[in-house]
Amino acid sequence: MANHDPISDMLTRIRNASEKRHETTKVPASRMTRSIAKVLQQEGFISEINEEGEGFRAELVLSLKYSGKHRLPTIRSMQRVSKPGLRIYKNTRGLPKVLGGLGVAIISTSKGVMSDRDARREGVGGEVLCYVY
């Protein structure tokens, strides 16, 4: 079955796996999902990214992070902002600060996919893909 929104699919798989305290989760690989996974790793939400398979069957294996002795997920919430039916674009000044800077907005810019902090530093705006905190 065709997936019409791979970003929402990725966020849902990560959210479900972290709620069930799984060590890893698999996500279909694409340039966009790789870029989002790299931003999540840079921001400390996932620990490792591995790739399995080749071609259209390739999958990213994401190692999820937990904190404390009760293994609380580092990802509390993931929300899709810009959707296929309603795209949300922001300029540099309009980029959101998630939870006053504690969370991350993932932005697709002309310079690639990056966090809101990096986009402000680069002075670029773009499509607000999701919020993670």
Curated annotation (Swiss-Prot):
Top-rank taxon of the source lineage equals Bacteria
Q: Which InterPro entries does the record associate with it?
A: Ribosomal_uS8, Ribosomal_uS8_CS, Ribosomal_uS8_sf
One term of GO molecular function? structural constituent of ribosome
Q: Which Pfam families match?
A: Ribosomal_S8
Question: In which residue ranges is the amino acid composition biased (Basic and acidic residues)?
Answer: 16-25
* Species: Synechococcus sp. (strain CC9902)
Family recorded in the similarity comment: Belongs to the universal ribosomal protein uS8 family.
Region annotation (Disordered) ranges: 1-30
The record's note on quaternary structure and interaction partners says: Part of the 30S ribosomal subunit. Contacts proteins S5 and S12.
Q: What is this protein called?
A: Small ribosomal subunit protein uS8
Example GO biological process: translation
Instruction: Return the GO cellular component terms, semicolon-separated.
Output: ribonucleoprotein complex; ribosome
What keywords tag this UniProt record?
Ribonucleoprotein, Ribosomal protein, RNA-binding, rRNA-binding
- Outline what the protein does: One of the primary rRNA binding proteins, it binds directly to 16S rRNA central domain where it helps coordinate assembly of the platform of the 30S subunit.
Any keyword Oxidoreductase?
no
